Amino acid sequence: MKLQLCAVGRLRSGPERDLVEDYLARFERTGRPLGLPPVQLLELEDRKGGGMEAEADLIAKAVAPGAALVILDERGRTLSSPEFADHLAHWRDSGRDVALAIGGADGLAPRLRDRADLAMSLGRMVWPHMLVRVMLAEQLYRAATILAGSPYHRV
């Protein structure tokens, strides 16, 4: 299993990058004994300014062949943290590669949304795509702690 986080744009040095790196390091430490691979963070830049369609091309090229494509989209399904952990465990157990995709400021092209195996929402509010990385990295770590039976996730 390979786990990719494909995100449009680059995080500059600062608190958001620090948080993403911290949560992904925590995920790696917690997930390794559970058979979860480290997250491969792919920051994709549309240098030609082609908008959502060009960003969709970059994401499609970055996704491992045959990987389950999970997109973050405001129209997607809202999962609880334990439900997300169940999905992560299922992907791990099936051995299927997974690519989590975060679009740019304008979202994801419809053709990429149509291709997705799962469209996930972090709630009904719209979030800046840079903050979505932090939130998703934290949820990956939280999912690993749920699978490990750690007290990090309290209900």
Curated annotation (Swiss-Prot):
Top enzyme class of this protein? transferase
Q: What is its EC number?
A: 2.1.1.177
Q: What is its main location?
A: cytoplasm
Mind naming one GO cellular-component term on file for this protein?
cytoplasm
List the subcellular locations: Cytoplasm
The catalysed reaction is:
pseudouridine(1915) in 23S rRNA + S-adenosyl-L-methionine = N(3)-methylpseudouridine(1915) in 23S rRNA + S-adenosyl-L-homocysteine + H(+)
Instruction: Name the keywords, alphabetized.
Output: Cytoplasm, Methyltransferase, rRNA processing, S-adenosyl-L-methionine, Transferase
The protein's GO terms of the molecular function aspect are: rRNA (pseudouridine-N3-)-methyltransferase activity
Binding residues for S-adenosyl-L-methionine: 72, 103, 122-127
Residue ranges spanning the membrane: these are none
Protein purpose: Specifically methylates the pseudouridine at position 1915 (m3Psi1915) in 23S rRNA.
Q: Which family does it belong to?
A: Belongs to the RNA methyltransferase RlmH family.
Please give the subunit comment from the record. Answer: Homodimer.
- UniProt-recorded name of the protein: Ribosomal RNA large subunit methyltransferase H
| Taxonomic lineage | Bacteria, Pseudomonadati, Pseudomonadota, Alphaproteobacteria, Rhodobacterales
What gene codes for this chain? Answer: rlmH
